């Protein structure tokens, strides 16, 4: 039986659940199995589930019915109470695989921030921001799926190593847009 690992991308907006425990992405703090606090899904073929996503919010400043400015928040979050694993089936390699799902989420948060930085206030800014958000999430979902397919959910260790190197390089390219 092929063991599968499951990744869930949670697309949350700021304010959905202020009591939800979240961990912001950090260069220095990597995930540990202790961060996966949900009860495992006994019916799942997966041995681990990482719940992470991009949290996005914005405000628009107007004057005399004209848009004169806007501000945004874009965060890469991990949700411990929605993430789980089967202790007896997991390894350091699987944890690396799960960490990279979170790193990929951070990469797309950086891409989102970069694209936002190129926008200027205008009457269509809300539509532009929402369109960018949808586009980034679509790209993120495709990349997460490709990552799982190419690594065979971490079973292909050579592919796992390739992806780790690739994502590290991509994160470096967008260093100025990293989560703070």
Segments predicted by a language model, with ranges:
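Short, well-structured alpha-helical interface segments that form or flank functional binding sites
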Residues: 90, 103, 107
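Active-site His/Glu-centered metal-binding helix of metallohydrolases
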Residues: 95-104
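Active-site scaffold of zinc-dependent metalloenzymes
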Residues: 66-90
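Short alpha-helical functional segments enriched in proximate histidine and acidic residues
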Residues: 102, 115, 143
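Metalloprotease/metallohydrolase-associated module, dominated by Zn2+-dependent proteases
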Residues: 20-68, 78, 120-180
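Bacterial Sec-dependent N-terminal signal peptides
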Residues: 1-23
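Membrane-interfacial alpha-helical segments at the cytosolic side of multi-pass membrane proteins
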Residues: 107-116
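Residue-level marker of positions within ordered structural domains that often coincide
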Residues: 7, 81, 145
């Amino acid at each position: 039986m092929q063991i599968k690992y499951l990744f869930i991308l949670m697309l949350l907006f700021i304010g959905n659940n202020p009591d939800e425990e979240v961990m912001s992405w950090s260069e220095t703090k990597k995930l540990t199995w202790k961060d996966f606090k949900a009860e495992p899904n006994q019916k799942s073929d997966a041995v681990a589930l990482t719940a992470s996503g991009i949290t996005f919010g914005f405000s628009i400043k107007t004057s005399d019915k004209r848009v004169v400015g806007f501000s945004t928040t874009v965060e890469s979050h991990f949700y411990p109470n929605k993430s789980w694993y089967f202790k007896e089936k997991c390894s350091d390699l699987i944890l690396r695989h799960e960490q990279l799902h979170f790193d990929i989420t951070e990469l797309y948060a950086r891409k989102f921030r970069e694209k936002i930085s190129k926008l200027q206030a205008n009457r269509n800014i809300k539509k532009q921001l929402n369109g960018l958000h949808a586009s980034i999430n679509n790209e993120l979902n495709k990349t997460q799926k490709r990552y799982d397919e190419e690594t065979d959910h971490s079973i292909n260790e050579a592919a796992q190593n390739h992806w780790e190197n690739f994502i590290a390089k991509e994160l470096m390219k967008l260093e100025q847009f990293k989560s703070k």
